[in-house]
């Protein structure tokens, strides 16, 4: 007899109902719970899967390069990045009638194509690619790399090549290699590419495989490096009149600290970027030699942690016990990694638009909007995952004995204070912000907009002024020509930075007013409420006053029956489930704010945001409704245009989103009865009754229905907004 899915759990494989399939999918990646799993095998499986993950990423990027080289217009775009629309790939669709074929034959193509809004053209252009041949070479290189990583993943699953558990637990060696090897060395390699290939290309000199060993990236060669005369590499930078991609106005510097932006491309100076990566490389390569391995020199992380113990004893045992706890818990490690990655992804979103690194990308408004929204959404999900795995750590891996009176134990002991403070902050922010919005909404509706309560964000304006914004008249730090901060920075990044921040042409520290003040506090409400739910879920995961033995029930459980009233909805998984709704709510407000404010800046119509963003109807009417009109007209009685694909996606996103509620607002018994009626009808219908099934159909469990509902809600939510965002921006700016 063939073994049934799932092979990793004999219990589930023998389940006679459709529960087998659902629970099989739900626990497929929960390796710890699989039959016969040992700790060593667990680490080996996860390690091997990393190679597969990298192979998929390289294959994906290889596909991007290949399709742009084959079907795109990279060479034409490179000649005129500001006016040619970049093509992602061709569309072959047998459903297209003549109207659709005409509508999607765009961007200078001779047949239907998709326009690229990912920014890859700008990236490849900035790093020195100019021809389709360059793209094909990159594609083939990544394809080979992908195959190598797949082989490495397979190899590390073979008995002879499986690392031992002690190898995985050797934290110091891993840190050294990851810091120096992965971060440090790769940053150094990237600096090398920028200096040897990208910067010469930006100055009109092509460097390829044929001449890169004979072309000096700097006229002085390596002499200044070996003589310690490093400042030579910063002398003679590109001038303000430099035409990117040509020798006109170009300098010879390779490592600079000019500050501000290249006047023509409105992107960071390539020589500044190279300098930044070199600095990162040096720091991380040094950091990768800090930790003690079998040579007996350097820091021991365990000793460092155990030394973190305030002498007066006011904070208990400090960090004692953390080394073993962290080193023995994959969930703890994953939670910290996800928290860090979530923060850095959100920072990427903020910096991509305020300090664009790629040439001419600042003028491709749809791409800027897409990249901001994309990174902010991803950051949202990753941060939620950090708390989910933090909660799983506390349930499965936390040992109260090993952590007696240390920082972890003390956080758990005063969790009530933490949770109640978060609750108070959320209530305060929610009632005050909503109160202001509703008040303003009412007085505007009654025709007396002058009665609005409008609060200037003076503290935020002060922070902007400290960074050099002169608009507000605060005489502080960089906004004061005579301050110590200004004097200290004058020789390096200052004049250029001040020009950029005050020019009105960049997205650096946009002017802010009462509308920004209100939406900032709405976002703060969303962030604090999401955090409250996630923190409470994790801190109560092991037990609460209501259910002291909660940890024995695992990460997700529906209820402990009617005998213990009120134990439904209190598992750590339920907290994660609820938090994702709040997180989506918050990222919605963040992206609405960013998009509307920037739309008005790009259109030269900032007054619209300033006047309409202070009351609710302004957001609904002047942002959502007004900007959806072009999108909704993608199809109309007169035919179709190139927004129709987004129009369709907008409708489809709403459908998926609404379907989510069918799973979220439902009760098991109803579905069970319905299923049994359908089965009855099926068995009595000719033809239909020829097909039978081995699994007895049963309704989804409470937790399953929630995860299916949440998945539909989430996917529908961001498909709807993605279509709105891209169509409303592209409809205005192409």
Curated annotation (Swiss-Prot):
Native species: Synechococcus elongatus (strain ATCC 33912 / PCC 7942 / FACHB-805)
Family as reported in the entry's similarity comment: Belongs to the PsaA/PsaB family.
Known EC number: 1.97.1.12
UniProt-listed NCBIfam families: psaB
Binding site residues for chlorophyll a B1: 654
Lineage top rank: taxon: Bacteria
Residues that coordinate or bind chlorophyll a B3: 662, 670
GO biological process: photosynthesis
Gene name in the database record: psaB
Subunit-level organization: The PsaA/B heterodimer binds the P700 chlorophyll special pair and subsequent electron acceptors. PSI consists of a core antenna complex that captures photons, and an electron transfer chain that converts photonic excitation into a charge separation. The cyanobacterial PSI reaction center is composed of one copy each of PsaA,B,C,D,E,F,I,J,K,L,M and X, and forms trimeric complexes.
Reactions performed catalytically: reduced [plastocyanin] + hnu + oxidized [2Fe-2S]-[ferredoxin] = oxidized [plastocyanin] + reduced [2Fe-2S]-[ferredoxin]
Keywords for this protein: 4Fe-4S, Chlorophyll, Chromophore, Electron transport, Iron, Iron-sulfur, Magnesium, Membrane, Metal-binding, Oxidoreductase, Photosynthesis, Photosystem I, Thylakoid, Transmembrane, Transmembrane helix, Transport
Coiled-coil segments: none
Protein name as annotated: Photosystem I P700 chlorophyll a apoprotein A2
